[in-house]
Each structure stands twice: as C-alpha cells, then as structure tokens.
Amino acid sequence: MRTRVLRCRPFSTRILLLLLFVLAFGVYCYFYNASPQNYNKPRISYPASMEHFKSSLTHTVKSRDEPTPDQCPALKESEADIDTVAIYPTFDFQPSWLRTKEFWDKSFEDRYERIHNDTTRPRLKVIVVPHSHNDPGWLKTFEQYFEWKTKNIINNIVNKLHQYPNMTFIWTEISFLNAWWERSHPVKQKALKKLIKEGRLEITTGGWVMPDEACTHIYALIDQFIEGHHWVKTNLGVIPKTGWSIDPFGHGATVPYLLDQSGLEGTIIQRIHYAWKQWLAERQIEEFYWLASWATTKPSMIVHNQPFDIYSIKSTCGPHPSICLSFDFRKIPGEYSEYTAKHEDITEHNLHSKAKTLIEEYDRIGSLTPHNVVLVPLGDDFRYEYSVEFDAQYVNYMKMFNYINAHKEIFNADVQFGTPLDYFNAMKERHQNIPSLKGDFFVYSDIFSEGKPAYWSGYYTTRPYQKILARQFEHQLRSAEILFTLVSNYIRQMGRQGEFGASEKKLEKSYEQLIYARRNLGLFQHHDAITGTSKSSVMQDYGTKLFTSLYHCIRLQEAALTTIMLPDQSLHSQSIIQSEVEWETYGKPPKKLQVSFIDKKKVILFNPLAETRTEVVTVRSNTSNIRVYDTHKRKHVLYQIMPSITIQDNGKSIVSDTTFDIMFVATIPPLTSISYKLQEHTNTSHHCVIFCNNCEQYQKSNVFQIKKMMPGDIQLENAVLKLLVNRNTGFLRQVYRKDIRKRTVVDVQFGAYQSAQRHSGAYLFMPHYDSPEKNVLHPYTNQNNMQDDNIIIVSGPISTEITTMYLPFLVHTIRIYNVPDPVLSRAILLETDVDFEAPPKNRETELFMRLQTDIQNGDIPEFYTDQNGFQYQKRVKVNKLGIEANYYPITTMACLQDEETRLTLLTNHAQGAAAYEPGRLEVMLDRRTLYDDFRGIGEGVVDNKPTTFQNWILIESMPGVTRAKRDTSEPGFKFVNERRFGPGQKESPYQVPSQTADYLSRMFNYPVNVYLVDTSEVGEIEVKPYQSFLQSFPPGIHLVTLRTITDDVLELFPSNESYMVLHRPGYSCAVGEKPVAKSPKFSSKTRFNGLNIQNITAVSLTGLKSLRPLTGLSDIHLNAMEVKTYKIRF
C-alpha cells in the first residue's frame, strides 16, 4: 500500500506544485518500481505539512563529521589457545560410551595407571568442599524453601563448624543469607562472621543469586552482583575472592568478564556439553583464562571446569558414579534413595578398603590435570538441613582423611576439607602454564538421564511473558535509580538553603522500596527464574514480586519528577505527575490512561539515556481535535491522530469515535525531561486513513476516512524503504532500499515444531522429527486462504502500518515511520500478539517466527548473536546435530550477513534463535508442552499468557557497497543492486553491530518514560518546560546505571554516594549508514547540572575495591567494549 504526502499551498502555487509532484511521481514509479508487473497498484494521498513532505521524500541527512579511529576503533578478534567455535563442530556427538553415560574408558584408565606410577609427579592433593546448593525458588517459592530448608542449613553450618574445627563450608546465594541474617540472633551472626574470618566458611561469588548466563541482561547481572557484594562487605566485612557457578545450564563469557572486573581470583563452572567434558579431560585441561572475544587485556581470573556431569556427590568423587554413591553418608530416617541403598558407615573393618577406593577415584581426577590438585564438592541440592547429616559426613570422611594422611607411604596423598580459595592457591603453586579460551559453552547438553543427548535450548524461550516483564522492570528500575540519585542529591544540596525539606523526606522514605526492587530483580536472575524453569506456582510468585516492585519504581519516578518539574512546592505531596501506563495486575497487559482537555492536557517525557534521541511517542486521548506543543522549544511538533480499533468475536472491526492514539515525534537531550502541551485544534490533515474490507458496513466514522483495499499485493513505503507485503498472509515479503536501489527478500513466516513428548519441556527443546512443521495459522485462516477481511492498514503523516489477524491466536503488525530521522526511517517494527488459549489447545507447540532471506550466509549457515546485551558471538551450524542443538540464546539481537548485506533482528527480551538453513533466521516466540522433560520440575509448561512480542528489523549494507547496480532479474525492478567497490578497507575481524543497530537497541530496551500531569484536584498549575540533568556527556558512552549507595549505618536509608557504571559499546562504522562521530571522551564541561561532586574514585565493577582517585569526570577513560564503575560523592 503506497503512502504519499501532499499539501496544497495557497491558490497561487497549488496547481504548480501539484503538477510537479505528479510529474516526479511518474518518473519515480517508472525507474524505481518495486512491485510485480501487471497488477493494479493502489495509490493513497492525504494531506500533511510541506516541511514533512520535503524531509520524508528526500530525507537528506545533515552532513556529519567522519569518526576518528578513537571514536570508532576497529576491534579485532582475540587470539586464544582454545576457540570453542572452531573446535565444537569437530566433536563426535555419538561416541560409543553414551550408553554407559561415562566418558571414562580404557584410554583414560591406561593414562591414569601411567601417571599413578610416575614417581616424578607431584603428590596428590585433594580439597573436599562441603556445600549445599540452595535454589532461591524452584519447586517451592523462595520463602517456602527458606522456612523449610535453608534457615536450618545455615544454622547447622554455624553450629557444626564450631563443633568440628577441621570442617569447612561455602555459601553462594546472598538472598538466602540476608533472609537468615535478618532473623538470626546477634550471637549467631558473630559466630558466622568468625567462621568467615577464619577462612572455614567462604562466601563464593557473592551475587544476590547464582544467575543464569543465557537469558540474563548485563544491567541485571551487574545490579545483582553489586547488591550481593555490598551486602557481604557491609555485614560480613569481606570481599568475595572466588566464584561458584555450578548449576546454570551452560556458561557464557559475560559472567567471567564481570567477575574478573569485580576482582575475583578464580571461579568454578560445572554444566557444559558432555563432548566438551571429554575433550577437556583428554587434554588434561581443567583450568583456563576465559578471554573476551575481542582483543583486550588478559584477565587475571582463572576458570576451573569440574570434569564430570553434575555437582552431586554421585558425580564428584571420581569418574564412576556407582562408586561415588557409596561415599554419600547421608542417612535420614524415612528417606530412601540410590545413595541410601549403598550406605555403609566407615568402621575399623572397612576403613582401609574404603580409603583405598576413595583415593583411587580422587587419583583418577588428578590424572585429568597436569598439577595433581583436585577439588571435590561434597553436597547436593538443599543438603545439610539435618544436623545428623553434618555428623555423618564429617565423621566418616575424617576417618578416611586421617587414615590416608597418616599413611603417605601407601597413598601418597594429602586430603582435607577446604574451600575453593584453598584449591586455587594450591593449584597456582604447582601450575602456571594455563591455556586461554574464547567463545562459550552453549548449547548445554547432558546424557545422564537416558544415555541419549538432550539439549537444553528450550529454556531460552520458556515463559516469554515473564522474560518480557523482567526486561520492562529493568528499564523502570534503572529510570528510578537515575532519577532518585539525581533528584535526591539535588534537593539535598539545595536543602542547605532551606528548600525541598518535605520532598527530601518523601524520597528518602521511598528508598526502602528501591532496595526491595533491586533485590526482586536480582532474585529473578536466578537460574530457575528468568529461565522459566520453576513450577508454575513459583513462576507466579516471581512474577508477582516483579510486578509489585515495578509499581513502586514507577511511583518513585513520579515523586522525583514532581519535585523537579513543579515549581510550587506545596504540590509535591500530591500525585500530580502520573505514568501514562497503568499496570493493573500481574498477568494482564498494561493500559494507557487517556489525556483530556479537562484535567490531563500536559505530558512530560523523560529520556533515561545519556544520549540525545528521537522517538515516536504515543498517548491516548478522548478527542481527535488536538495538536502537540513543545513548551521548551515553543513550537508545535509533528503528530498524527490514529484510531483505536476493536476486534469483535466475529472478526468485524469497530473504529472508535471516542478513543484515539496521538502519535508525535520528540527529540530529547540526554537525561532530560521535557513537557508537552496538548492543545485543542481541528486539522483533519493529521488524521490517518484506514483501509479495511471488514469494518462494519453501517459504521461511518466521523473522524477517519475508511476505504476499501485495492487489488494486488500491498506496499508500505516511506522516503527510505519500500516494503512488499504478501496479501495472502499479511506478512512481509521483501524490502527495497531506495538509497542504494537494492531489494532484499525478507519473507516472514510463522510456524511451529511439534514437541517430542516427554523429551521437550521447560528446559529441553526436542522437536518430533517424524512430524512435519505445524501450520499453526491454518485453523485461524479464512476458508478461501485470503486475508483481505482480516487486514487493516492505517496510514498517516508519521507512520504506516498493516495489521493482519488470525484470531484469537495471532495478530501481527508491520510498521514503518516516515519521520526525518536516519534511524527510525530505516527500521521496520514488527509487533506480534500471541494467545495460545487455554490448554489443551495448541499442545506440544513450539511457536517460531522465521525470516527467510536471500542473504548468502554460507552453505553451512553462520549467524551472530549477542550475549547478555554486552558482547557478540559467531554461531556456525553443526550439520551433525538437529535444530534443537543449533538454537542459541539472544537477549538483544541476532544477525545474518554476507558480503553485501546484513540483516539484524532486534529483540527486547531473551529468546532462542537459529539459522538452520542458508538465508534463514528464526526466533522462538512461545512454547507449550503438556509433559515434563524429566529435569526436575515434574510438570509441563501450560501456563502461557497472552503476550506481545516486539522486534525491529534493520537491513544494512556491508563494507564496500557504495551505490546501486542494475539488476533486471526481477520483473518490475529497474536499476537495482548496482554497486561499486571503493578502495580496499580492512574490516574489523570482531563482528559487532552497526552504530545504528547499537543505538536502536538501547532505544528499544530503554524507551522514553511518559507521564501525564493530572490537574483534576489542583486546577491549572505551572510545569517547568525543561529540566536537563546532564551536560556534555560523551555520546559514545552508555550510562548503565547511576545507583545510590545505601548508608553504612542506617540500613534502609540512602547516602550521598553513588556508583556510576559506564559501558562503551563496540559498534561498526563500516556497516550501514555513514556513522555519526560519537566521542567517547569526557571533558572539563561534562557535569551533572545543579550538582556538586565532592570526589570521584575509580573502583572495581561492584565497588568493593578502590583503584585510583580522579580529579573529575574529565579523567574517565574507557576502551571499546569496557565496563567500568566510578564512585561519586555528591
């Protein structure tokens, strides 16, 4: 459907302009026609401003300075001893040992015998680490687990370590430790601190939880590490030195980077692909330095991989689970399991044989290392909740340890209880030649359930409603953090002059809710929360916590903006500035509040990013006679009036005459709030035109033109893009870029894999290979397979969109913007509403959105995914494996590319993505599996909620393409794909997004915050037109957060100190449009407006270690991709 913009000038110029336009239009259609021949193309015209017409048609971009190498460095791939991308496809994924579930075969046993008999080899040293893995929610909620298990476990740690001076323990989940601390007697608190000071109880990792590493976003990861580390430092007086990450389902490079930046010396990982376990064991590699994928300084933190399947005693004492089971001495009355069946206490009669068997298993682990130091976890999920287990494990193991250590002539070993820090210290004394590794360990696969490979790629997508809610909450928390820090310190400093006393107290009171919000976000980063892999009732509890804290964050934002935007302080105690979105209840989509000329005719926008942005904002109104006025620039802005359309049960569309969406364009400086006024005004040129074949015949809209759609395929068009839409489906078919006259096939499809029953569930993804892909839309399609009656097109001065409906299952919208912005005009927004309906409908359905393109990304397809919104990873299809093993996690984007074109798909939540066939990119949207996949939760996933998915598509030129080339291969296309190659340029080996994609991703994840000014109780009031909190901040730097530090003495009160966490994103200046010069340098002019900084210090990522004092913000420097933290005292 073509859109054209036209406005009549006064009579003297109107006819001339009209003739010129018709002539230009005819020439344009002849040369740049992008539609198939011999079909009747609909033409649409509607009035708009001439300024918009010019900018939209020509879309000239202001001249920009060329970026310097410092502003846009060409990043290089790091060089490592182990490259996971190169090595992984070479594995034998069906080795002969799968049926035994143990890779330990004769070759390993023979090597063990040789090493055991080598008299020059260092003596075996074994560090046994008692632990209890406490999930902060899984089969039960956080609170239920704490009351049922965890508080008893921590009490037993305190009591039994005092009783047994040789025993040690570790603790990782600070969320649980905080709950215990708040309820424990000071005597117990002191006893616990004493154990930590003695080094017998080690706090490992120190995060609020043990986070998932596939679905988490960098903001939430950093935030929960800061929250946990500060709790540890404040309450226990220590700084974590080692990490313990034994249960996340696969491991990526981001968490090791963050831990290294936080000052940890070593970390331990567990769950990686069974083939990686074998490969590393064969090469005696248990430790490595995990490099970032881009060339940067070598990390100082060492990563240790546990060599066997899982962290339970059955799998940790050595390569033979049947032997290890007999060394689990837990025996609780009424408990019967595989380990109780083999239970046998150590006595003087079996001491020698048991000690010999145990040390042989330990020695076998030692043969997998060059240094002969062995770390052996001793525990399992929620272990040691009974004091008798402490007694049994300690007494039996100490008998064997004492016997082994007393008979070195027989065993040649030292065995002791210890901690991970003890292990790393002992290992480093013997081993310095540690290899480096780059890449990651996704997809995780196990074989210990059935002796068959099972791929844990389902959880990348499971329960998308909660994944989306979590990201929305991140955005609201981040905005609340920044506003609280800026406004509270502003009024504190102004308060010295006697102002803002009441406002300061109100904000201080809200700080407690900010702490709870941080902790609820941190809790959801747990590897059974954001993954969607807890029981349905537990997921409901997580969601309710997120929803509650999201509500409080929005209220805090409103209070902060009320203080700063309303000059009349007597109004600060009232709820006048209100979010334009109402979150009524968990599980339901948010609603927009209506603006009104009676009491809500002012809108405030806050840009939470530290960079200027142009955004299209939509507010709801009860009138269409309206226009938008920027009170700061004192001018009217570009806007359009859109209909509110209701779909009836019979599929008929009702266009409302009482509810309207006002869409306008706003350009907002960094960390700035601007007020807009909605003025009564009648101008139908700003009203959208509706094309609809199935709108009620009797309905005659008094506001909008409603027209029938014309025959033929549908085109959406702005000044830069021309989209061809398949009329039979309503989905995108191809994209034509006018600036380089190039067509790209982008065929959007929706389908589903049928789940393999009992092999696909919350964790696992396994399609039923004997069943074809499911045509999920067929039951919701018209009998004639034509979508005409289910398509609505809405076209206006700012946007054009097409919506196609397969009710009630799926509603899909394609939107492009016709605004003078180089980013928004080049991007395509896809919005998909999915409702699985109540089970058993759509059972065993793994729903995907697929983009089939003509991009030549290799016969063995390659694509790129982000990792945690921080870095980027190349993915190569492994032909030996099925689709389930070729799905990878994304959190912000994925892209396909060849020598000429890159397609980037942006997302605002975690989901799985694959490029299983050449030119194809698909993302999983939602999953419903009726059956459990036998990985612990004991139920399927049937609690699907109606969910709205949003994605942006960017299609960009790769380096070397400078202009179009004639291509007559497609009928109707003229002068397409013409190009010429410029001088040879060295491309950046490390693939990063374009500057446009990087910027659009941040806009997508951190949208403008919109508020209404409610004057229903106070009448007309003064609202400041503009409030900027930042000046001369370098646009090449992303402000991750500006987070107030809690007072050292008053636990729930804020201090005047904050952490400013910064990230310098890496992006390519060679891909896509000519980049804007974005300086990463801070200057003497960089400041927070209205705030005095007493001092600033460079600190470790979580702030526990001071690195160096700075003279001011101008001393800050970040290299590309780096994340750094600075402590600011206001």
Curated annotation (Swiss-Prot):
One MF term in the entry's GO annotations: carbohydrate binding
Pathway this chain belongs to: Protein modification; protein glycosylation
Listed Gene3D superfamilies: Glycoside hydrolase 38, N terminal domain (3.20.110.10), Glycoside hydrolase family 38, central domain (1.20.1270.50), Golgi alpha-mannosidase II (2.60.40.1180), Golgi alpha-mannosidase II, domain 4 (2.70.98.30)
Cofactor note: Binds 1 zinc ion per subunit.
Catalysed transformations (reactions): N(4)-{beta-D-GlcNAc-(1->2)-alpha-D-Man-(1->3)-[alpha-D-Man-(1->3)-[alpha-D-Man-(1->6)]-alpha-D-Man-(1->6)]-beta-D-Man-(1->4)-beta-D-GlcNAc-(1->4)-beta-D-GlcNAc}-L-asparaginyl-[protein] + 2 H2O = 2 alpha-D-mannopyranose + an N(4)-{beta-D-GlcNAc-(1->2)-alpha-D-Man-(1->3)-[alpha-D-Man-(1->6)]-beta-D-Man-(1->4)-beta-D-GlcNAc-(1->4)-beta-D-GlcNAc}-L-asparaginyl-[protein]
GO CC annotation terms, alphabetical: endoplasmic reticulum; Golgi membrane
Protein role: Catalyzes the first committed step in the biosynthesis of complex N-glycans. It controls conversion of high mannose to complex N-glycans; the final hydrolytic step in the N-glycan maturation pathway.
Protein name per the record: Alpha-mannosidase 2
Originating organism: Spodoptera frugiperda (Fall armyworm)
Organism lineage string: Eukaryota, Metazoa, Ecdysozoa, Arthropoda, Hexapoda
